């Protein structure tokens, strides 16, 4: 994967997270504060716990830090997969965010763009 392809895919993932936070805040009382600084998003929950997602450009990975631990994801096939257990990024984010928010939350992967 080229650096440009990585950047496009990673930025798409971060944008999907921001969009999901807006939707979740509109549809639930989760009240997630999401702040983006460059290639990093910090999600702060009402109990003040956080999930931090950041891009690791030299490794072409996305890293996530949650109360459950730290996780590294690499793009394989058509999704971001954990480098240790191959679990999907947005599935993990949904699980960890639900645990930290104390209610079920769903973060969806961006829809792939075809025809490029």
UniProtKB/Swiss-Prot annotation:
- What protein family is recorded? Belongs to the frataxin family.
- Listed as disulfide-bonded, the cysteine pairs are none
Give the InterPro entries listed for this entry: CyaY, Frataxin/CyaY, Frataxin/CyaY_sf, Frataxin_CS
Functional summary from the UniProt entry:
Involved in iron-sulfur (Fe-S) cluster assembly. May act as a regulator of Fe-S biogenesis.
Q: Which Pfam families match?
A: Frataxin_Cyay
Task: Say which species the protein is native to.
Answer: Polaromonas sp. (strain JS666 / ATCC BAA-500)
Gene3D superfamilies in the record: Frataxin/CyaY (3.30.920.10)
Q: Which domain of life is it from?
A: Bacteria
Q: What is this protein called?
A: Iron-sulfur cluster assembly protein CyaY
Q: Name one GO cellular component term.
A: cytosol
